[in-house]
Amino acid sequence: MSRTLSHTTARLGLAAGLLLAAIGVRAATRVAAAPQAVTLDGILHADNDDTLAFTPDGDTVFFDRSEGKRKTIMVAQRRHGHWMPPQVAAFSGTWFDQDPLVAPDGSYLLFNSDRPVRPGGQPLVQDYFVGGRAPGSNIWRVNREGRGWGKPVWLGPVINNDVFVDFASVAADGTLYFIRFDAKARVMHTWRARYRDGAYLPPQRAGLGDPDVSTHDPAVAPDESFIVFDYGKVKGGLGRLCIAFREGAHWGWPIDLGDAVNRDLPWGAHLAPDGRSVYVTGNAGIGRLSLAPWLRPPAAAPAR
């Protein structure tokens, strides 16, 4: 999602309490530290960069950069332990592009764009929640080709069936999570589409929390054992970073990650390569949040 209007820290305590009561999340029962600031050797701009997405080896990062009314996806490489200055990604630079996401195996990348679906067409526009016309969004895919990346391909009408389909997250088996505005409920919902035989099945609502409450920016674990997302964000309002765990065929109730985590109004969660932390963007910039207080310790290797 794009950067939202800032809210003063002085209002956060009261507003957060009211929001928790209103949206019915489970209050935090474990203490989590605030996200740790991330600058990547100073190449990131705290005021206009967000949504870090790393390749599995951690040596390449994609993110989006805001410049006025434009958003562009940037890419940077780590060489000899140091991050090089970012460049505009080969598939970006013309349209309103944002929210890159690298698949768990690194074989492809997804991103959002308002670019025309067909050559020569008009860019997508929407008026759902900004009080007027704003860039629309569909999800596009770029495959890894050798040491580079291919051409963007529209993800198709099964997924992109609206002018605002946004913020993809992918499980290891290709199952896709994304957000789309529910015009009937007047809230943003997270949707889930399974991937079978090279195609997406029709998406269904993921079932995160109360259907009358907006969800944004999902970051799902490769095995779908947990999902981190923004819960309760409405027009002009606050959202809270939450986690939910898989319970059979359904998701458990959202668990609020606590005031220390939510003090900076984080959004845009992306799972880190370690699978046990997320990168988020807040009013102060980009941070890395350990999920260790919420996750079980990794299984020990069998004794030999």
Q: Predicted segments — roles?
A:
Residues 3, 22, 105:
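Residue-level marker of positions within ordered structural domains that often coincide
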Residues 2-14:
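Bacterial N-terminal signal peptides that target proteins for export
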Residues 28-304:
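Short, conserved micro-motifs composed of acidic
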Residues 13-22:
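Bacterial N-terminal signal peptides
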